[in-house]
Amino acid sequence: MNQEEKLLQEVSAIAHRLKELHNDAVIAYTPQVQELCDKKATQNEVEKMLDWLLMYAGDERMLKLYKQVCRTYWQIYPESIAFYIMEYRKEYDRESLIGTEYEYLLHEDEMDEK
């Protein structure tokens, strides 16, 4: 096996493990999100859940859970939910910021490095 084949095999194994990790996250977080949305959670509880879900929001199933929390608590904690929606957009949907008043957020990382 040459170097290129070995590298391809290693990358494939990492991709497979990442897919398993996302599957595990969906299984673990689905009942937690349901429980959170079925009660009047504190702002801190909602923010912690969204922090965890944001890490996996690139997966459509996790994004669905993320949106469920946002929709459930939008009217109760509007500032927090608006913040987490913007965090999602900055991380996973950067194109949606182009041409908006939030376009400057696309350059935050560059400003932090200076």
Please report, for each region that a protein language model flagged, where it lies by residue.
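Generic low-complexity, intrinsically disordered sequence content enriched
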Residues: 12, 22, 109-110
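Amphipathic alpha-helical binding modules
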Residues: 62-114
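Short, charged, low-complexity amphipathic alpha-helix
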Residues: 1-13
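Amphipathic alpha-helical interaction modules
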Residues: 16-68
